């Protein structure tokens, strides 16, 4: 399911980004990690938010520097690539219909079943670091992760963004 609206997001650096509802997926059907990343990258490309090299950059970076995280009972991933592949800052969100395997961040050998993906497409490296830190804070709250996983509508997603101050 795809969304239709945009929600503006302010970061610590005063930079404005968007959670575009056209690249927000609830119950994304993906056969594996690569399929999920390709679908999300394609949605960013179709919205003219990233360059044609963004998908390749995300896939290559994921191979070298895995982004899978095991947080309590949840598996999630925060894939991203270099800022030169970004036209306009964006964060794509997907909850997956069925979990897919990602390799664990910091340990390229172990895998985690991922059901939530936050794909970062940010123009400035400092924004990327700031957003990664903010997301890591959010990921420490199991209740919030459960709410993201159970989110089925744009309205619920929008309310959740407001709750975690990513509105």
Language-model-derived ranges and their functions:
Residues 1-167:
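Cytosolic covalent-transfer regions centered on His/Cys nucleophiles
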């Amino acid at each position: 399911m795809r969304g239709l609206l945009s929600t503006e997001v302010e970061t610590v650096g005063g930079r404005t980004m968007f959670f575009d509802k056209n690249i927000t997926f609830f119950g994304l059907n993906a056969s594996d990690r690569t399929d999920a990343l390709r679908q999300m990258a394609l949605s960013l490309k179709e919205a003219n938010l990233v360059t044609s090299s963004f998908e390749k950059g995300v896939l290559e970076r994921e191979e070298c520097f895995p982004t899978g995280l095991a947080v309590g009972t949840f598996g999630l991933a925060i894939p991203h690539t270099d800022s030169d592949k970004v036209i306009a800052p964006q964060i794509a969100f997907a909850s997956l219909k069925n979990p897919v395997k990602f390799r664990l961040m910091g340990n390229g050998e172990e895998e985690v079943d991922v059901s939530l993906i936050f794909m970062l497409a940010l123009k400035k490296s400092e924004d990327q670091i700031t957003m990664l830190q903010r997301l890591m804070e959010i990921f420490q709250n199991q209740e919030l992760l459960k709410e993201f996983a159970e989110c089925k509508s744009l309205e619920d997603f929008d309310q959740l963004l407001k709750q975690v101050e990513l509105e």
